Amino acid sequence: MRKVYGIQLLLLMSASLLLAVAPVRSQEKKPVVIAIPVGLSGVNSVVAPAVVQSAELAADELNAKGGILGQPVKVVPLDDESGPAGAVKAFNTGIRQDKADVIITMETSAARNAGAPIAERAKVPFIYTSFYEGRACGEYLFVNAWVPEQVVPPLIKFMTDEKKVKRWSAVGSDYAFGRGMIEAAKKTIKDMGGIILGEEYQPLQQSDWTAIISKIRAANPDGIIYSTSGGGPNIDFLKQLKAAGLTMPIGSLSIDELTAEAGGNAAEGVYYTGDYFTGIDNPENKRFLEAMKKKFGAELKTPNALSEQEYDGLHAYAMAAEKAGTTNADAIIKVLPTVVFEGPRGSVQMNKQNHAPLPIYLAQVQADGKTKVLRDFGLIDPGDQCPTR
């Protein structure tokens, strides 16, 4: 009888132990969820797949090393439809339904402006990986891509000094990024003694640039500086400009390698500055490109200055979580500015008012749509983006 009681007691203790351990094991296996609201449809649909691919490679690399704090990394792409209404839906879905630990993504400025307050209210860290017009600030918002202070002066100076552009036409998409970048360009042009002959803006969803191109032809500038939204609008504008026979030097504040390549020869000759190009010659970039080719093969979307930063963002977040010993949001935002990720662009640290000093390069689109790096300007500071931080 005692033997039976002993066995029953042993079974009861074993069951209790299993029940006690089960929640711990479940907690250990709970994934770290990274939401990626991005323009899978709309104007950003040209570049969005490359953003997702960068995230997937980073997640694979992290999971191969045991994940984040021993938990698997799960990326959740969400279509923000390249605009504010879609961003509101995507951010709410990512935070409420998918229980995102962090949001890491590239978006239009309109989408970011709609989504960022949702992340801020929910106290979810948001690493914004897109170049943008600057001055977006929040306790939970971090930016690892360029702002106007880093790319506009080098581009305008090059075109002024070496392409002899003094009289300019300025063209932009009619939203925060387009107008913000053109404002920065106008200031730099005037500071360098140049003249703005005309300034025109196109509604974001409109693809016919005929009226604006007619005004450029009438103004007869030495050169053009433009800033559309990322992706397709660049190609629409440049194709129509080429068809109109306008051949003056062009500087872009919105194009990227993937978009230029997708446009065939439409962007041939266009100059642009940025913090990432596939032609950057360093070991980490070579390793990154090889890993991307190995993972995606024929499906690979050319890594570019709107997608590579996603890869950096995931790794920086992982480093912050490991350093903090937790994925708790308040702990993460304290540690995030202190981590330095050595990646394809070089050393990146979001320690300047939640923005990052970045290496900046000058490049030009070739006849086949490929981009050639022409010059390395070195590390450039983002300036005062959020002075109260």
Where are these regions (language model features)?
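Extracytosolic ligand-binding ectodomains
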Residues: 2-389
